[in-house]
Amino acid sequence: MVLSPADKTNVKAAWDKVGGHAGDYGAEALERMFLSFPTTKTYFPHFDLSHGSAQVKGHGKKVGDALGNAVAHMDDLPGALSALSDLHAYKLRVDPVNFKLLSHCLLVTLACHHPGDFTPAVHASLDKFLASVSTVLVSKYR
């Protein structure tokens, strides 16, 4: 999915507002995903999935950091996310549908924390961006 210049501007502006909360938002999105889509828990049998657990917070930070890297490299998502794509495809073998589920939970989390900034245009841009990230992450599955 091609991001327009307006989409890139919207994504960067939204991510700037996330600021130092990327890890917290990542953890919150993971918690939402585990509660809303319980089958996603199967990839984390060794985690304490309770609210506020250190393991969920730690993985949330990884999610937030990866998205921050993707925002910084929007013009080369395949290059920026290649190692992460390899990890999820070859080692972790995550079902590709889970990226869509997490993307949805991230959108909900961002909308909850920044309701005034979450306009239809920003929502659409973030959705396109997260779909692009998901596409790159599943590209090694073929």
Curated annotation (Swiss-Prot):
Q: How does it assemble?
A: Heterotetramer of two alpha chains and two beta chains.
Look up keyword Metal-binding and say if it applies.
yes
Q: Which residues carry this modification: Phosphotyrosine?
A: Y25
Q: Domain of life here?
A: Eukaryota
One GO CC term on file: hemoglobin complex
Family that this chain belongs to: Belongs to the globin family.
**Origin species:** Antrozous pallidus
Q: Quote the protein name from its UniProt record.
A: Hemoglobin subunit alpha
N6-succinyllysine: residues carrying this PTM: K8, K12, K17, K41
Where heme b binds, per the record, is at H88
Provide the free-text tissue specificity comment from this protein's UniProt record: Red blood cells.
Functional note: Involved in oxygen transport from the lung to the various peripheral tissues.
- Residue(s) carrying N6-acetyllysine: K17
The UniProt GO MF terms for this protein read: haptoglobin binding; heme binding; iron ion binding; organic acid binding; oxygen binding; oxygen carrier activity; peroxidase activity
Q: Name one Pfam family in it.
A: Globin
Recite the UniProt keywords alphabetically. Acetylation, Heme, Iron, Metal-binding, Oxygen transport, Phosphoprotein, Transport
Keyword Nucleotide-binding appears in the UniProt entry: no
Q: Which residues carry this modification: Phosphothreonine?
A: T9, T109, T135
